[in-house]
Structure formats: structure tokens, C-alpha cells
């Protein structure tokens, strides 16, 4: 049961229902106005009700949209080209050699995943060797690793924050400012070593970032949907402009497929409906993401945010409590490494799960000798063979009446997402397919998939605790929290 979409195929053979059976059951859960909803989404007219703003990330797929949202196309392109060619100079006249993207959540996971997956598509190896780094952790742990290997005079920092007020991000930025002080003035740093990417232009201006160093995107682009926007700058810096545009083209092709393909051929809709059936009818509360290509090793973390932040909710878009299961727990890891870690539990443990396997059938290896290319091709076949074998064993199981340790119960439903090759287009199509899957499940469950009040509530409580740690408050919480605070003092 392989269904073909743009740059991507989906095999649902190991699900519990055929596609026709699925449409007769879970398909009836699609709301009456589903066609209108997906049209609205792709036109930028769907509403994020709780935050009273449109949902516009799909509009970012246009090759020219990122540049338009960043005020002028030439400025986005020029910034990328100058940095990648070594023509962008720091305040002391030395070329910029390192870029550090400081962000968290959607300002980190998507850009970092895209840069890692597509870095081999940079077709200008002779140009300046620009290194792109990512910093997100609020504890400063990543700064410990990055700051010793970069030079203040040759490093540019991208401050990526939709609100331009994210506490995690600015904790890192404040430490960087302290690190910079012995080498550069604050004016030098802001004018020549900082780029801001945000939906809040005024916030960037108030911080002191010159307008020429600001890249904006629309307020209707949610953080977890933002790698297509100006927040994808670090991807473009890694790959160059053309591979970044190709990624947008692949996503746009999946948008059109989502709008136009019949339901029984529609990859995002089928992913959504199988997920709904497995959650509601089979009672399975988790989905493992298992990519079998090392370039996609960051996919599980990205999809964890995309899905769980969107649909991990107990209330409808109208803020009414619900009493049925919604989005599953998303987890997983790089498949070949998982085989030597958690696959034992998947094969012979008691817990039920569903899985999305992701495989790439072929991989080009330009720049290597014939012998090396042959070896790499053999390794790709090895990865595909293992993907197919473990998926089959998880589904069909294996019995040995004489040895309980050789019994594999099977019965675990799974999808297989297939790319003939991992290209910028197929990568863009893959991510867009999952976005539309999450959207479809959200409308089935009556959710607003574009807010995240749980995240905001946690931030507020954290600030209350921080004030106590800083001696600005004597508020008491609970026995455990108070004991840790006292121990830290």
C-alpha cells in the first residue's frame, strides 16, 4: 500500500486497516468543513483563535516570501552571500568566520535540523569556510563549548526570537555580551557582530540592533513552523541560497498535494487518520520516530515539538474541556543507533507503540573516489535492509515455542516514509507533510494547534522561583521546591 506524493512516498502496509477501511472509520472523523479549513490554512486565513492572529507559515513556502518578510529580497540574499564568501567583515576589519545562532524551541530545532540535514548541498566549497553553531540551552552549557573556539572579532551572533524577549535566549545573549566586553565595545558588537531575527521589529530596535541588521517575519508564523521564514537564515548560511529555496519548493509541492490529492492518496491526511485511529481505537498513546539516515537524526526532536506543543491539549479551540485522547507522546531516535539501545524493548517489551520509519533509498557521494562511493552505497543498502527488517519484525513478530527468549509478539502498527534520495526538495516535503498531519489531527480533535499556554504557564512559575533564588522574594512553594532552594543558597 505505497502511496506516492511529491518527493515522498508512504507505505501503510503494516497498519491495522487498509486505506479503504481507514476512510470508512477514522475518515468519518474529518469535520464537515475540512476542505475549507485546509484552503484557509494555505491562504493564510486560518485563525489562531486564542491569540487572535492568522496562521501564515504556509505562505512562507514561496521562494520569495522569506525575502519579502525580511523587508527586501536583496538584503537577505546579500547577507548570506557576503557571509559565505568572506566579504562580511567584523568591526576590526577581519572577515567573519563563525556564526552562532542563539535561539530556543522553534528558533533552534528547525534551523539546526535543516542545516544539519542539508549541509552537503552547499555547492560552493571553494568559498570562505563559514562555520555555523547553535546555542539554545538556558544553563549556558552550549556556550561553554562554543565560546572557547570562536573569536569575538570574527564571530557574528544571530539572536533568533519571535517575541525578542525569550528568557532562555537572552540569558545566553547576556553572557555573550559579557564575553565580548574585553574585546569590543557594545556599539561595535551591535553594529557589526549581531543580526536579529524576530516578529518584533521594535524590540530589536530597542535592544540596539540597527535596522539593516534586522530580519523580520510575520506574527502569524508560529515558532515551531518557522524554519521556512527568516528564521531559516542559519540554514541558508549553511547551504547557500539555492538549496534553501529548493527546500521551500519541496514544501510548497506538499502544500499543493495536501490541497488537491484525493483523501485515499493524500499523504498528510493518511498520516493523520492512521494516527487518530491508533490513538482512539487501539488506545496507543505514543509514536516513535525512527529515521534511518544519519542526516535526519534531529527529526525526532523536531517532530516532538511540532506535534506535542500543537496537539498535547485537554481543551478545544473554544476553550472547552474535553474527555477524549488527543496528541500522542512523540519520541524516538536515529534508527541504527536505536537498534543498540531501545529496540530490545520495542521487540520484546510489554508496551504498545506505533512507529514512523523514515528511509532514504539512495545517496550520491560526489567528491569521493569510486571505491569510497561504492562503500558508502553499500552502507546505505545496509541501513535500508535494517529498516525494513526491524519494521517487519515489529509488525509480524516471530515465534519459537521452545524458547521464550526467542519470542517476538509483534503487532505494532507502523508507517514507512520513503525518499528515493534526501534532497532539499524531499526534506521540505517531509517536514510540510508532518505539519499538515498535525493540523489535520488538530481539526479532528477540535483543538487550536497554534497556541501553547502550558509553556507560558511554566515560564511564569519559573520566574516566581527565580525571584526567590535571587533574594527578591520570600515566597514559599512546596516542601520539595523549598528544600532545593534552601540547598542552593
Curated annotation (Swiss-Prot):
One Pfam family in the UniProt entry:
PGI
Which GO terms fall under biological process for this protein? gluconeogenesis; glucose 6-phosphate metabolic process; glycolytic process
PROSITE patterns, per the entry: P_GLUCOSE_ISOMERASE_1, P_GLUCOSE_ISOMERASE_2, P_GLUCOSE_ISOMERASE_3
Chief subcellular location equals: cytoplasm
A GO-annotated cellular component: cytosol
> Active site annotated at which positions?
309, 340, 459
**What EC number(s) does its UniProt record assign?**
5.3.1.9
Give compartment(s): Cytoplasm
Write down the chemical reaction(s) this protein catalyses: alpha-D-glucose 6-phosphate = beta-D-fructose 6-phosphate
Could you tell me the keywords of this UniProt record? Answer: Cytoplasm, Gluconeogenesis, Glycolysis, Isomerase
Q: In which pathway does it act?
A: Carbohydrate biosynthesis; gluconeogenesis; Carbohydrate degradation; glycolysis; D-glyceraldehyde 3-phosphate and glycerone phosphate from D-glucose: step 2/4
Q: EC class of this enzyme?
A: isomerase
Q: Which CDD domains match?
A: SIS_PGI_1, SIS_PGI_2
- List the Gene3D superfamilies: 1.10.1390.10, Glucose-6-phosphate isomerase like protein, domain 1 (3.40.50.10490)
The record, for NCBIfam families, names: PRK00179.1
What HAMAP family does the database record attribute to this sequence? G6P_isomerase
Q: What is this protein called?
A: Glucose-6-phosphate isomerase
Q: Which organism is it from?
A: Idiomarina loihiensis (strain ATCC BAA-735 / DSM 15497 / L2-TR)
Amino acid at each position: 500500500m505505497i502511496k506516492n506524493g511529491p518527493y515522498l512516498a508512504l507505505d501503510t502496509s503494516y497498519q491495522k486497516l487498509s486505506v479503504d477501511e481507514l476512510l470508512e472509520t477514522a475518515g468519518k472523523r474529518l469535520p464537515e468543513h475540512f476542505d475549507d479549513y485546509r484552503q484557509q490554512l494555505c491562504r493564510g486565513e486560518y485563525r489562531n483563535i486564542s491569540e487572535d492572529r492568522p496562521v501564515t507559515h504556509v505562505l512562507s513556502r514561496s521562494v520569495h516570501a522569506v525575502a519579502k518578510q525580511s523587508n527586501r529580497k536583496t538584503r537577505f540574499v546579500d547577507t548570506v552571500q557576503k557571509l559565505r564568501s568572506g566579504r562580511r567583515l567584523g568591526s576590526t576589519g577581519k572577515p567573519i568566520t563563525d556564526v552562532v545562532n542563539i535561539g530556543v524551541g522553534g528558533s533552534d530545532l528547525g534551523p539546526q535540523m535543516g542545516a544539519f540535514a542539508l549541509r552537503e548541498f552547499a555547492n560552493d566549497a571553494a568559498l570562505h569556510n563559514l562555520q555555523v553553531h547553535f546555542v539554545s540551552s538556558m544553563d549556558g552549557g552550549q556556550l561553554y563549548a562554543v565560546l572557547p573556539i570562536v573569536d569575538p572579532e570574527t564571530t557574528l551572533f544571530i539572536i533568533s526570537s519571535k517575541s525578542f524577549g525569550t528568557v532562555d535566549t537572552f540569558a545566553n545573549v547576556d553572557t555573550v555580551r559579557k564575553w565580548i566586553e574585553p574585546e569590543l565595545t557594545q556599539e561595535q558588537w551591535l553594529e557589526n557582530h549581531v543580526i536579529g531575527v524576530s516578529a518584533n521589529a521594535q524590540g530589536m530596535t530597542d535592544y540596539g540592533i540597527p535596522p539593516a541588521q534586522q530580519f523580520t517575519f510575520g506574527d502569524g508564523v508560529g515558532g515551531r513552523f518557522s524554519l521556512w521564514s527568516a528564521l531559516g537564515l542559519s540554514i541558508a548560511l549553511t547551504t547557500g541560497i539555492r538549496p534553501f529555496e529548493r527546500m521551500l519548493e519541496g514544501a510548497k509541492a506538499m502544500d499543493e498535494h495536501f490541497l488537491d490529492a484525493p483523501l485515499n492518496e493524500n499523504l498528510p491526511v493518511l498520516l493523520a487518520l492512521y494516527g487518530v485511529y491508533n490513538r482512539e481505537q487501539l488506545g496507543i498513546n505514543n509514536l516513535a520516530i525512527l529515521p534511518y539516515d544519519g542526516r535526519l537524526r534531529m527529526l525526532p526532536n523536531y517532530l516532538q515539538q511540532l506535534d506535542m506543543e500543537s496537539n498535547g491539549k485537554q481543551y478545544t479551540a473554544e476553550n472547552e474541556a474535553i474527555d477524549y485522547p488527543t496528541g500522542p507522546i512523540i519520541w524516538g531516535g536515529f534508527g541504527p543507533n536505536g537498534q543498540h539501545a531501545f529496540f530490545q524493548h520495542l521487540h520484546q517489551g510489554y508496551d504498545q507503540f506505533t512507529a514512523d520509519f523514515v528511509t532514504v533509498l539512495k545517496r550520491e557521494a560526489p567528491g569521493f573516489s569510486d571505491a569510497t562511493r561504492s562503500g558508502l552505497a553499500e552502507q546505505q543498502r545496509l541501513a535500508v535492509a535494517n529498516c525494513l527488517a526491524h519494521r517487519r519484525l515489529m509488525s509480524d513478530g516471530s515465534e519459537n515455542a521452545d524458547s521464550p527468549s526467542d519470542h517476538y509478539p509483534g503487532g505494532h502498527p507502523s508507517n514507512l516514509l520513503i525518499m528515493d534520495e534526501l534532497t532539499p526538495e524531499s526534506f521540505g516535503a517531509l517536514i510540510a507533510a508532518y505539519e499538515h498531519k498535525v493540523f489535520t489531527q488538530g481539526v479532528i480533535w477540535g483543538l487550536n494547534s497554534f497556541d501553547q499556554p502550558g509553556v507560558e504557564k511554566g515560564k511564569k512559575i519559573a520566574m516566581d522561583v527565580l525571584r526567590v533564588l535571587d533574594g527578591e522574594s520570600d515566597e514559599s512553594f512546596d516542601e520539595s521546591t523549598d528544600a532545593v532552594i534552601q540547598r542552593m543558597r
